[in-house]
A protein has these predicted regions:
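Cell-envelope/extracellular polymer assembly enzymes that use nucleotide-activated donors
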Residues: 6-8, 40, 199
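Catalytic donor-sugar/metal-binding loop of nucleotide-sugar-dependent glycosyltransferases
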Residues: 178-179, 198-208
Length: 208
């Protein structure tokens, strides 16, 4: 029976042809190949219509550790959930396709994970954080949203929406199977599922 990988990197995608031109997936694999632990990459697609899926399969053929998961267009929440639950890693990270947070930043998350934390999240609001190419109005909107979330649901978490979150195998199964806001994968026209991060962290806070 194959040994489960130490880390699963789950990358959701939707119409990513422009990002694929920037070799983002090659950069992910290049980093992982330098590590001394076993790994896999789950490319979980949200019903792309621009040729992304074909490119993902072509990329996966080059590496036995890379797998492609095709989903209906239901939005980021269900797409990430499908990938996280399909992953086999002892630890599972989901990260944005454009690698706005480079995968090497996981080294900062390991510091917390090694202190017996089962959920560790990235934050763009920490001292020294750099928001690459983010418009000022998006930053302001994000700050307003996070203030509202802190007030109503999850006090103490400065950035719920950063797409860089690490979960143990146990936490993954416990939390992602409890998601209700977008618990069922249904095809959507707008496919807006931004609230899934908030629900996920709310559940994690209850677990702590």
């Amino acid at each position: 029976m194959p040994t489960k990988p130490y880390l699963s990197v789950v990358i959701p995608s939707y119409n990513e042809m422009e990002n694929l031109k920037n070799n983002v997936l090659e950069k992910v694999v290049t980093y992982l190949k330098k590590q001394d632990y076993t790994w896999e990459v789950i490319l979980t697609d949200d019903g792309s219509q621009d040729g992304t899926v074909k490119k993902l399969h072509q990329f996966a053929k080059k590496y036995s550790q890379v797998k492609v998961l095709e989903n209906i267009h239901a939005g980021k929440g269900p797409t990430v959930k499908a990938g996280m639950l399909a992953a086999q890693g002892q630890w599972r990270l989901f990260t944005d396709f454009d690698q706005s947070t480079p995968l090497a930043e996981i080294e900062k998350l390991w510091l917390r994970a090694n202190q017996n934390h089962e959920v560790v999240i990235g934050s763009r609001e920490m001292v020294g954080s750099v928001r690459d190419k983010e418009p000022w109005y998006r930053h302001l909107m994000g700050r307003g949203f996070n203030i509202l979330v802190q007030t109503l649901a999850i006090p103490g978490i400065l950035d719920t929406q950063c797409g860089f979150k690490l979960f143990s195998d146990h936490a993954t199964k416990l939390l992602f199977n409890q998601l209700h806001v977008y618990g069922q994968q249904e095809q959507r026209g707008d496919a807006f599922t931004g609230a899934f991060d908030v629900e996920l962290l709310f559940l994690a806070k209850k677990m702590a």
